[in-house]
Design a protein with these regions (language model features):
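Predominantly a Rossmann-like dinucleotide-binding segment in NAD(P)-dependent oxidoreductases
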Residues: 49-136, 286
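Contiguous beta-strand/loop segments that form the cofactor/metal-binding neighborhood of enzyme cores
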Residues: 101, 107-194, 238-255, 277-279, ...
């Protein structure tokens, strides 16, 4: 796990960059966050959705009041995985945490938009179509309901047992809505009778590259998992470049807006795992779980 190297780096006064998920339990996350805070070092997690141009534009539009107050977010990351996914460690729950943890990006993004962790969560799901040992032991269908104060909600769907592939984030407001679509890559703003379209990534070439990849892997989305020696996709290289440029600028003294502060302390990453842990407990005990039960 990441805990020993993060604690060692912090203890030596070194800044830390950690891939997501930073850990598979809230307690491990809290230990790492506390160590980095106590040693006054940056602790950044690889939550790359924060560096999508579309996500940045959506946050800008929301901040300007274009879609009003956010009422509801709906994220989906669904596909079909065949044997192309069987070679990767990500299919082993003890190593990756399963879809909810190793695909934590959408949950993290929703929490950034909604202002933090929900009050309560409920998760249903299980292994519907991948019971053969070749496919690992993670659940291939997960359905999450997140309840926030002031009657605001979010729903997340994750899984690898969906023949109709979807990957999007839908943000519903009192005056309009925004959809960030990663399959047919593009972002749409809808207000009244008006629609406006924006890029998700830096260029149309990167958006088209992502659309092409989803279409080519629709029959077996497991092919998308990275492997040593495989060149990153064009769109993925783009957001990695944006992320590393941001981190480099911060380490060289660039000012940081309030929006990104939780990304540099590990708190946003920790809070995402808190919600994931609450969801896991909900599924295990078949009940609604308060986040306060996890974040004691």
């Amino acid at each position: 796990g990441c805990v020993p190297p993060v604690l060692a780096a912090a203890g030596h006064g070194l800044h830390v960059f950690c891939e997501k998920p930073i850990a598979l339990s809230f307690e491990d996350c809290r230990e790492m966050v506390d160590a980095c805070r106590d040693n006054h070092v940056v602790f950044m997690a690889g939550h790359v959705m924060n560096f999508f141009r579309g996500v940045r534009k959506a946050k800008e539009l929301i901040g300007q009041g274009v879609i009003g107050d956010i009422l509801y977010c709906h994220g989906a990351r669904n596909a079909w995985e065949g044997t192309g996914a069987s070679e990767t460690w990500k299919k082993t729950r003890s190593k990756s945490g399963g879809h909810l943890y190793h695909h934590i990006h959408e949950l993290d993004c929703v929490q950034f938009l909604m202002g933090g962790c929900p009050e309560t969560v409920t998760m249903a799901g299980g292994n519907a179509a991948h019971r053969d040992d070749r496919f690992g032991d993670e659940d291939d269908m997960l359905f999450i309901t997140m309840e926030y104060p002031d009657r605001r909600y979010a729903v997340l769907e994750y899984g690898s047992a969906f023949r109709w592939q979807e990957h999007y984030l839908l943000i519903q407001g009192t005056r309009g809505a925004i959809k960030i679509d990663m399959c047919s890559c593009g972002m749409t703003l809808k207000t009244g009778e008006k629609e406006e379209h924006f890029l998700v990534h830096r260029t149309k070439e990167e958006d088209d590259d992502r659309t092409r990849i989803y279409r080519e892997t629709e029959r077996d989305n497991g092919n998308q998992f990275g492997r040593p020696g495989r060149k990153p996709f064009l769109w993925l290289q783009g957001i990695m470049d944006e992320e590393m440029e941001f981190l480099n600028n911060v380490l060289h003294g660039a000012p940081v807006t309030d929006e990104f502060l939780p990304l540099l302390t590990g708190e946003a990453a920790r809070n995402s795992i808190a919600t994931a842990d609450a969801c896991t407990l909900s599924l295990k005990e078949d009940r609604k779980v308060k986040l306060s039960e996890i974040m004691k």
